[in-house]
Amino acid sequence: MHIDYLCDHPELIEELATLNFKEWGEFRPGQTVEHRIEHMRESCGKGAVPSVVVALEGSRLLGGALLIESDLKLRPNLTPWLAGVYVKAEERGRGIASQLVDRVVAEAAALGVPELYLYTDTSQSLYARLGWEVVEELVYEELPVTVMKYVILR
């Protein structure tokens, strides 16, 4: 298994975007899978914000994660964000999500980013184990979520 930039594997954009849409599309009313594909395509930077990394086994997609400018409309002052951390169900339990998160943190650190943010409704313990701190609990799009941050530069 290795992690690479999605922009170096454009044939996987549609697959990753579709997986993201199936996982979180219900929380974005009015968004279509086509919109998610376009957003994924636009986010395909390399060594920049935005960028997308993917976990691969050979050429097979296992999961992905994004580094984006903003992910929570309620907190526009917080930037940048780790978003869309997703691992295919059959590949979970192998530490892939942790490796994707670590890679995005490393990307942000290389860019001189002092802090990175995320929000989650279910994976607080995963991120806490990786060193993320709770910022606040709130309701976003009718869903209780936890906003967390990772301090890169102390």
Whereabouts are the PLM-identified features?
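A short beta-loop-alpha structural element at the N-terminal edge
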Residues: 2-16
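Hydrophobic alpha-helical core bundles mediating ligand binding, dimerization, or RNAP-core interactions
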Residues: 16-24
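Active-site rim helix/loop that mediates acceptor-substrate recognition in acyltransferases
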Residues: 26-56, 62
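Conserved beta-strand in the GNAT
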Residues: 52-54, 60-70, 81, 86
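Conserved acetyl-CoA-binding loop-helix of GNAT-fold acetyltransferases
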Residues: 84-87, 93-106
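Conserved GNAT acetyl-CoA-binding A-motif
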Residues: 108-121
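C-terminal "cap" of GNAT-fold acetyltransferases
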Residues: 118-123, 136-154
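Conserved acetyl-CoA-binding loop of GNAT-fold acetyltransferases
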Residues: 128-138
